[in-house]
Swiss-Prot record:
It comes from Pseudomonas fluorescens (strain ATCC BAA-477 / NRRL B-23932 / Pf-5). The gene is ccmA. It is found in: Cell inner membrane. This is Cytochrome c biogenesis ATP-binding export protein CcmA. Pfam families: ABC_tran. The lineage of its organism: Bacteria, Pseudomonadati, Pseudomonadota, Gammaproteobacteria, Pseudomonadales. It is a peripheral membrane protein.
Length: 211
């Protein structure tokens, strides 16, 4: 059996004195796409944040290459890309400046690569304009352009289709599936029904793990 890149072991999460889920198990290997589903308040975003190392579990642990996630910050940055529900961009900066800044935190990217990534998400001609002049959908595309740069193998995405039009949704679906088919991994939440799923797709319903 292939060793997982990321593994959740007996994971439990409590928020505001309420146990959202417990005893959760998850293994991620190349080619996997995992959709986290469940009713509102079931802990979908909390689970993503736990897997991304942005929160600590109430009990259990998250392992990266078999070792505790919290002890491997540099290794985590090399292996994982997180895009949250909010666009997470600086509105006074341009799309190019935002991507340059985000990439500089982990792996700097050439200007040509950044422009190609922005073109891939339909932002050709908007590279140098302040992001506060862009629509919500365009701002979302700025964040998603990171997926078109040289990026880590594991993508953790919270509602990535938010504010995208029909064409943008179809393009992103294809890109996510292609990433998995090339050996990458995706964990995501979405209220959108996926039309394009790789062979490694599976759904985890947090209702099964509710306390």
């Amino acid at each position: 059996m292939t060793s997982p890149l990321l593994e959740a072991v007996a994971l439990a999460c409590e928020r505001d004195w309420r146990m959202l889920f417990e005893h959760l198990e998850l293994r991620l290997t190349g080619g996997d796409m995992v959709q986290i589903s469940g009713p509102n308040g079931s802990g979908k975003t909390s689970l993503l944040r736990l897997l991304a190392g942005l929160m600590q579990p109430t009990s259990g642990q998250v392992l990266l290459n078999g070792q505790p996630l919290h002890a491997q910050r540099a290794e985590l940055a090399r292996n994982l890309l997180w895009i949250g529900h909010a666009a997470g961009i600086k509105e006074l900066l341009s799309p190019e400046e935002n991507l340059s800044w985000l990439c500089a935190l982990h792996q700097p990217a050439r200007r040509e690569a950044i422009w190609q990534a922005l073109a891939a998400v339909g932002l050709r001609g908007f590279e140098d304009v302040p992001c506060h002049t862009l629509s919500a959908g365009q701002q979302r595309r700025v964040a998603l352009a990171r997926l078109y740069l040289d990026s880590p193998p594991l993508w953790i995405l919270d509602e990535p289709f938010t504010a995208l039009d029909k064409q943008g949704v179809a393009q992103l679906e294809e890109h996510l599936a292609g990433h998995c088919e090339r050996g990458g991994m995706v964990v995501l939440t979405t209220h959108h029904s996926l039309a394009r799923m790789p062979s490694g797709y599976r759904d985890i319903d947090l209702g099964r793990w509710a306390a």
